[in-house]
Amino acid sequence: MSKPAGSTSRILDIPCKVCGDRSSGKHYGVYACDGCSGFFKRSIRRNRTYVCKSGNQGGCPVDKTHRNQCRACRLKKCLEVNMNKDAVQHERGPRTSTIRKQVALYFRGHKEESSGAPHFPATALPAPAFFTAVSQLEPHGLELAAVAGTPERQALVGLAQPTPKYPHEVNGTPMYLYEVATESVCESAARLLFMSIKWAKSVPAFSTLSLQDQLMLLEDAWRELFVLGIAQWAIPVDANTLLAVSGMNGDNTDSQKLNKIISEIQALQEVVARFRQLRLDATEFACLKCIVTFKAVPTHSGSELRSFRNAAAIAALQDEAQLTLNSYIHTRYPTQPCRFGKLLLLLPALRSISPSTIEEVFFKKTIGNVPITRLLSDMYKSSDI
């Protein structure tokens, strides 16, 4: 659905008629957030019938905090505020991934129009000076907003456009800012990958290195950045969902390969759960991203061992990132003296899932057999990112 005329800031000031969160425009006849409009669309398109958890149809609270707790009451509220069932396009199945088109554009150099270009809200957080630019690019939510008529590449350039802060935490616990359907997991994963590139370019210290060193660091760290992103933005990692997304099953996949992938998905679940248990804030995530990125160790490219041009500078940047994180935790969490050590001890677990498994599960449907490293290099060199 297209947004009404006017600035994004004005649209975001209009509350969702269903849950009271910030709306992203008119959906099915009423102002609604992307979470509620998506829920309504899926419910109507799939002809869902829900049962109230409390047995009191319509009695459950439907607000930003509780909107995901009772689907029956949420759907009832959607209908009460006059969301139009007839406006849901039943004849149209799940849309073809716009991310696939976006990736293709970077290889073809073309621009195309899309009615489903992604939008990433962002906001600035107080942070140490070393990470000022980084924190400004850290989004508080991964929304699936539709911006009609916007060129897809232009949408990618605008990933970090500042918007009002989203009230997304209760006692430091991240809230789910949108419901992720199975068909959207690949798109969310691709967005995390794009954001890693945008993030790397936003770090002033990173851009001072030679292009060769920048690309080598990014190619080596993308897996850890991706897993950190999953932990930060609550992308679902249950095995059934991910296997459904990838299309792999016992009928079409070698049993040894399938068992390996399931084992690594379980490892991914464990590491993500450990990060979420510690309830990291945006600055801590930014520091950890720098720590895993600035690794001055030789990397392999096939059978070739490549060395960095300025390994000393890279090592110094990692030291600075660790010192910054330690200082920040000491100030922000004075009652948790072991927090810094706990976070560092979690970092090796980020590599418990192989790059090939991430590509197979999250990206193969989106970009086919294009290697992620090739995509990273191509997009990082693009002036549009």
From Swiss-Prot:
Cellular component annotations (GO), alphabetically ordered? nucleus
Protein family per UniProt: Belongs to the nuclear hormone receptor family. NR2 subfamily.
Q: Where are the transmembrane segments?
A: none
**Pfam families recorded for this chain?**
Hormone_recep, zf-C4
Zinc finger residue ranges, NR C4-type: 16-36, 52-78
On tissue specificity, the annotation reads: Expressed exclusively in the neuroepithelium of the embryonic brain.
Tell me if Transcription is a UniProt keyword of this record: yes
Principal localization?
Answer: nucleus
Domain NR LBD, first and last residues per copy: 155-383
> Which GO BP terms, alphabetically?
cell differentiation; negative regulation of transcription by RNA polymerase II
Q: What protein name is recorded for this chain? A: Nuclear receptor subfamily 2 group E member 1
Gene for this chain: NR2E1
Keyword set, alphabetical order:
Activator, Developmental protein, DNA-binding, Metal-binding, Nucleus, Receptor, Repressor, Transcription, Transcription regulation, Zinc, Zinc-finger
The subcellular location is: Nucleus
